[in-house]
C-alpha cells in the first residue's frame, strides 16, 4: 500500500497556492489529508482537489502537528509568523516567500543543487527561490562547470501574477479603460501599467536596488553554490499576466563555443532550447508549461567571451509551485 503524507498549503487561495494544489493533483503526489489555509479574509473559500472542493481554513487556528509538510505560498510576514510554529510542532516547511534566509532554510532548485537534500533531518525548513532565480538557476546549472562564468547581468521582465490577483486585475482593468477611451485611474500601481514598462518593482533602497533584485542575486549565488559570483540584476514590471522573460548576458573567462553551449542546454533537464532562428515567448510558449524556454543563444557583438541568452517561463508554475512540489517529491522518503 502506498504511503501517504499529510500536507498543508498556506496561501491556498493565491495564484501560487492554487497552482500548487493543482500540481499536487497532476503529479499524483501521495497526499493523505490536504489542509488548505489562508488568512481570515479567504477562510471559508473552496479549492478543487481530486474531484472535491476542499474548504480553506484560517491559518491562525491550525494545529501544525496534524501535517508533515507545509508549503508556505503566502507573503513573507505569514511565513515569519507561522513557519516557526510549524517546525516546533514537527511539521517540515518549504517556503516560497523568500522570508527565510538561506542559512536557515537552504534554497534548492532540483536541477541545480538537489544534493543539498541528502541527509536532511526533519522537521526541516527549505526555501524555494523566487521564479527569476529558480529559472535562471535551471539554465546556468549545466553551464557552470562548462564555462568560466565571471559575471552575470540579467534584466527580468516580470509578469503581473508575481504580485497576485490584485495586480492581474489592475492590468486587465487599465487595458479595458484605455481601449474604451475612458480616463485611467491607477489603483494597485501608482501609474499606468497597461501598454507600459515600469523600471522598478518595489521600492529601492538607498543604493537603488529593490528587494526583488537583491533576492535574485542572493538566491542565485546560493543555488549555484558560487558565493563570489558577480551578479547585476534589474527587475522591471511588464504588462503581461503570466510568464517572466529574462535577458541574460554572461561575461566569461574565455571565448564561448556556441555549439558546446547549445548541446549542454539541449541535454539538460527542465530546459527547452529553441534555436534555428526561432525564439520563445511567454504567451506563445511558456505559460502552463513545466520547462524554461531558452533562445537567442549568441556571443557578444564584439566580445567572443560574452554569452547572451533569452529565457522565458511560467513564473507561477515552473518558477514557483512546480519547483516546490518537485522538492517535496525528492523529500517524501525522509518524511516517513
Q: What is each of the regions a protein language model found here?
A:
Residues 2-191, 228-230, 292-293, 297-303, ...:
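N-terminal Rossmann-like NAD(P) cofactor-binding subdomain of oxidoreductases
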Residues 5, 70, 160-336:
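Charged docking surfaces used in two-component/phosphorelay signaling
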Amino acid at each position: 500500500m502506498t504511503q501517504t503524507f499529510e500536507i498543508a498549503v498556506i496561501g491556498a487561495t493565491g495564484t501560487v497556492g492554487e497552482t500548487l494544489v493543482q500540481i499536487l493533483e497532476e503529479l499524483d503526489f501521495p497526499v493523505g489529508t490536504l489542509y488548505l489555509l489562508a488568512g481570515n479574509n479567504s477562510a471559508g473559500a473552496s479549492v478543487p482537489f481530486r474531484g472535491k472542493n476542499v474548504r480553506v481554513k484560517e491559518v491562525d487556528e491550525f494545529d501544525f502537528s496534524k501535517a508533515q509538510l507545509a508549503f508556505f505560498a503566502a507573503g513573507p510576514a505569514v511565513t515569519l509568523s507561522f513557519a516557526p510554529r510549524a517546525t516546533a510542532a514537527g511539521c517540515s516547511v518549504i517556503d516560497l516567500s523568500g522570508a527565510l534566509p538561506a542559512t536557515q532554510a537552504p534554497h534548492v532548485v532540483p536541477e541545480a543543487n538537489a544534493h543539498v537534500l541528502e541527509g536532511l533531518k526533519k522537521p526541516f525548513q527549505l526555501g524555494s527561490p523566487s521564479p527569476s532565480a529558480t529559472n535562471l538557476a535551471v539554465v546556468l546549472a549545466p553551464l557552470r562547470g562548462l564555462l568560466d562564468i565571471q559575471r552575470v547581468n540579467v534584466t527580468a521582465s516580470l509578469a503581473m501574477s508575481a504580485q497576485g490577483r490584485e495586480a492581474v486585475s489592475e492590468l486587465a482593468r487599465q487595458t479595458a479603460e484605455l481601449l474604451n477611451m475612458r480616463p485611467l485611474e491607477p489603483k494597485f500601481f501608482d501609474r499606468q501599467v497597461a501598454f507600459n514598462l515600469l523600471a522598478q518593482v518595489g521600492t529601492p533602497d538607498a543604493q537603488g536596488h529593490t528587494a526583488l533584485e537583491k533576492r535574485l542575486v542572493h538566491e542565485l549565488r546560493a543555488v549555484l553554490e558560487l558565493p563570489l559570483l558577480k551578479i547585476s540584476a534589474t527587475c522591471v514590471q511588464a504588462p503581461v499576466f503570466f510568464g517572466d522573460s529574462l535577458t541574460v548576458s554572461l561575461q566569461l573567462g574565455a571565448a564561448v563555443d556556441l555549439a558546446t553551449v547549445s548541446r549542454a542546454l539541449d541535454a539538460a533537464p527542465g530546459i527547452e532550447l529553441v534555436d534555428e532562428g526561432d525564439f520563445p515567448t511567454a504567451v506563445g510558449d511558456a505559460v502552463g508549461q513545466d520547462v524554461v524556454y531558452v533562445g537567442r543563444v549568441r556571443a557578444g557583438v564584439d566580445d567572443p567571451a560574452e554569452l547572451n541568452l533569452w529565457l522565458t517561463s511560467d513564473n507561477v508554475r515552473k518558477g514557483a509551485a512546480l519547483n516546490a512540489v518537485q522538492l517535496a517529491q525528492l523529500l517524501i522518503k525522509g518524511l516517513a
